[in-house]
Each structure stands twice: as C-alpha cells, then as structure tokens.
C-alpha cells in the first residue's frame, strides 16, 4: 500500500481473500473505500459513478457523479476482476498505472493509494486481458491453511470472519480502538513517506542480482519440463518492482536497498501459478550467486593445488583456504540472518532459503576436509 502498487489475490473460494483485502483499508486514517463484486453484467456506472443528468441538462456536459465510487476512493477492492467487461477493464488501465480518470472532458488525479483485486482464476488467454494483468504488480496466491495447529486455531477462533466484515470483535476492535487509531497512516504521512521513498538509494550489488534474475527468467525450468520457459516481465513492471524495493528499505529504516529486500519480488515475476516456486528458486540462487561463484573458484584452485602440491604449510607461501572458507561461511550466515530479519520475507521463504543453504554448507565442509590433503605426505 505504501508503495502505491496494485495487488491481486488469487485462490479458490473460502481462503479469506476478501477478508484480507477489506482489512487493508484500516491501515489508513479517514480513508474512503470502494468495493464491488464484478459480473458479466457489471457496467461502468456501477464502478465509476452514473452519468450526471443535471450536468447533461444544465450544460450539455457528459460527466459522471463520482462521489462514493472508485474515483474518490483511497482503497479499492474489486472481486472477480476478470468478469468485468472491456469498458471497465480499459478504464482500469490508466486508473491503476497513472492513477488518472477521465471524467467527461476533465482528467481527474485520483486519491487512490491501494487497489486490490481478487479472483479464483488467472485471466483467460486470447481475450485481451494481458495489459490489465500486467498492471497488477504483486501477485499473491491465497491457499488453504496447511499446518494442522493453525487450522484448529481457525476453527476455535470466534473472531474469525471470512466475510471481511468489521462486525467480528477482533476486526471491530482493530478498526475502532483508539490505541490502534494512533497507528493509522494519515494523508500527510502518506505523502511525506512517498517522497522519502523516492530518495532511497539502490546498491550496485542489488542491481547485479536483478540482472542475474532477469537473465535467468529467459530459461525457467518449470516442473522439470523438457522445454524451458521464457517468462516476460515488462520494463514497466521492473520499474514498479524498484519502487517496492525502495519501500521495503524505507519501512526498515534503511537509506539503501539491500539484497535481503529482493527475495519477495518473485511474487511480481510469475505469469502462471506453476512458475512461482521455480522463480523463487531463481531469486534465492541469484542472491547467493556471488558466494557460490567464489566457492566454485576456490574448489577448482584447491583441486589444482592438491594435484601439483604447490601449497606450503606457512600462510605466506600459499593461498589461505581456511580463511576463505571462514569468510564464505560468514557471508552465508550474514545474508541468511538479514533475510530472516526482513519484515517482508515469509516463514515459507525462510524455510526455502535454509533448505538451499544446507547443501551450500555441506560443500563448505567437504572443501574444508579437502584442504587437509595439501599436507598429506
């Protein structure tokens, strides 16, 4: 929301997509919200406001009465987004990307801070939905509860309300409690933070990792298929991702984007749901690629030194492999801890990082053992 980027929640019915979307508006103080359940019969009047009969009569002007509709909302939730007709979808293109709405012969700058859409399915192919799909920068899959203890907790929680209504005690307390209201973001804070986010720098090593990810997306191995996929990510989407990275750094009191901010961007890169995990693996490998390359180079050099017995026991006369191994281990541990401390890295993502690093640490241990061969008679 602070980055101003759009979100789409994808998943089967009954996994609380609507509840999540509706509760996001409670983050803003005095925010106006608009929500609508799309259908094949939805009209632009229902989303953007009806045509003003008074304007037509008095000045022969075609304008919509937008008060209470999407053009005046801070937070918007559109359910079943792909069921909307072409007229609504085409208007949403400029609403989402430029936050502009053409009302008659006037162009309105919208107060829109966050637009959340939801659907049970991906957009159908061949129906001209690609441009609108590309506008949704963050793509989150909502899935049923996996852990048994969490499922039981949900069953026993009398406050859980999958409708998203604030009628449940837990939601009402959050929305109306005075203590929480002090934490809500005001319009002035939002504008100030937005300017500060623009000033956040991006480290050169972050750009290097992004380049590796971008190249890797040209040949993605999905579900061990024989043919690799070339996953297209538009320049506009990369620009929006950079904004998300700056927001991540700002929210964690940093003046520059670090590599630890990069892991969640896999949510912005997939086109088909089965690509998600493969792209997450690509991002994780890209994050640790500099350290992996150092390990490969060191192992190759060590193999040569063992083969030709070129290393001496004194550090001055040979390469300090022990020191390099310690340095690599420290680098792995440091980045793993940074990812673990990042506010936007989920527990599932942390588990994937740990699984990847287990093999990395094993390789370091084997390499450490190999160094002993340098001193064998």
Regions found by a protein language model. Give the residues of each.
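Basic, amphipathic alpha-helical bundle interface domains used for macromolecular binding and assembly
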Residues: 168, 173-277
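Phosphate-binding P-loop
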Residues: 1-4, 12, 68-71, 107-109
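Conserved RecA-like P-loop NTPase ATPase core
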Residues: 9, 47, 79, 92, ...
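C-terminal engagement/docking regions of AAA+ P-loop ATPases
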Residues: 223-233, 239, 247-377
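Short glycine-rich substrate-engagement loop in P-loop NTPases that contacts/grips substrate
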Residues: 40-71
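Canonical AAA+ ATPase core
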Residues: 35, 54-59, 75-88, 96-184, ...
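Walker A/P-loop
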Residues: 2-40
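Amphipathic alpha-helical transducer elements in NTP-driven molecular machines
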Residues: 18, 41-44, 63-67, 78, ...
């Amino acid at each position: 929301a602070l980055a101003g980027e759009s979100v789409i929640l994808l998943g089967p019915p009954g996994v609380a997509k609507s509840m999540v979307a509706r509760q996001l508006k409670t983050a803003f103080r005095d925010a106006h919200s608009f929500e609508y359940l799309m259908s094949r019969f939805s009209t632009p009047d229902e989303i953007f406001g009806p045509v003003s009969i008074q304007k037509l009569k008095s000045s022969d002007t075609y304008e919509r009465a937008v008060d209470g509709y999407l053009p005046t909302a801070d937070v918007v939730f559109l359910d079943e987004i792909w069921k909307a007709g072409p007229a609504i979808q085409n208007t949403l293109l400029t609403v989402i990307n430029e936050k502009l709405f053409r009302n008659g012969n006037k162009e309105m700058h919208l107060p829109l801070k966050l637009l959340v859409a939801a659907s049970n399915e991906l957009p159908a192919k061949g129906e001209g939905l690609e441009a609108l799909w590309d506008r949704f920068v963050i793509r989150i899959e909502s899935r049923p509860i996996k852990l048994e203890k969490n499922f039981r907790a949900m069953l026993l929680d009398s406050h859980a309300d999958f409708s998203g209504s604030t009628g449940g005690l837990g939601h009402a307390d959050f929305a109306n409690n005075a203590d929480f209201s002090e934490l809500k973001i005001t319009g002035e804070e939002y504008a100030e933070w937005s300017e500060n986010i623009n000033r956040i720098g991006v480290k050169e090593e972050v750009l290097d990792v992004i380049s590796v990810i971008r190249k890797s997306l040209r040949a993605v191995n999905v579900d061990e298929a024989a043919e690799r996929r070339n996953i297209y990510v538009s320049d506009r989407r990369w620009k929006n991702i950079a904004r998300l990275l700056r927001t991540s750094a700002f929210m964690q009191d940093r003046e520059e984007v670090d590599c630890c901010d990069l892991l969640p961007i896999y949510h912005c890169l997939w086109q088909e749901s089965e690509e998600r995990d493969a792209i997450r693996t690509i991002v994780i490998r890209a994050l640790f690629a500099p350290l992996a390359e150092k390990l490969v180079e060191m192992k190759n050099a060590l193999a040569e030194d063992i083969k030709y017995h070129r290393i001496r026991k004194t550090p001055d006369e040979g390469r300090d492999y022990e020191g390099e191994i310690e340095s690599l281990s420290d680098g792995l541990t440091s980045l793993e801890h940074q990812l673990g401390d990042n506010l936007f890295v989920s527990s599932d993502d942390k588990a994937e990082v740990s699984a990847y690093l287990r093999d990395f640490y094993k390789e370091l241990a084997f390499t450490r053992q190999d160094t002993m061969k340098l001193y064998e008679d």
